[in-house]
Amino acid sequence: QKMKVFKIAIPIIIIISILSVDYYNKYYKDNTDFENESIYLYVIKDDSLGFTDSISKYFKSTKTFYKVAEKLGYLNNKKTGRFKIDKGVGNNEIVRSLKFNNTPVNVTFNNQERIENLASRVSKQILEDSLSLIKAFRNEDFLKENGLNDKNVLSIFIPNSYNVYWNTTSDDFRDKMLTEYNKFWNQVRSKKAENMGLSKLEVISLASIVQIESRKIDERPK
């Protein structure tokens, strides 16, 4: 009787072992294929072809990734964004990162002479294109609500580096820049501008002109 049970148990144990190894390999075995400690995947929700091209560069097996991603309900719920993937992780962790690890970018710009130049500079660093950004920057309701116009709106964009999500909208980016502008003008800076007989926008505008002219001088042939 014991021998009969043993003969039945052995194949079951073997099958369970094979299934366990297969499960581990699919979900937890390292599926990354890059040298750096981490990479960033730029995902656009409805761009399936672009997504496949991206993961094929960085994953050892796209086949197992897609199987796990489907099981975990990711493929029908892709999110647009910039996602950090660490080296040495399996498909389970990769999918988790693609769900929850949208990582900001550092958007940097210096003084620009025209709103079009600024939009072009920013559009190279986030998903939105320059036309969408220009439209948001020149939105009539936005300008009216904040006492701005088409000529002075450029002054609210203070040259610096800013943490924003790669998939931020043009309106959200513009509103963040206005918030940063208002933060910049604390009580001390506001008082200094007042003492000089200048408005906040005039101070920023003058500083921008000085920097641009200085840059032009530096760029002249020696």
What label would you give each PLM region?
Residues 3-222:
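Conserved catalytic or metal-liganding residues and their short signature motifs at active sites
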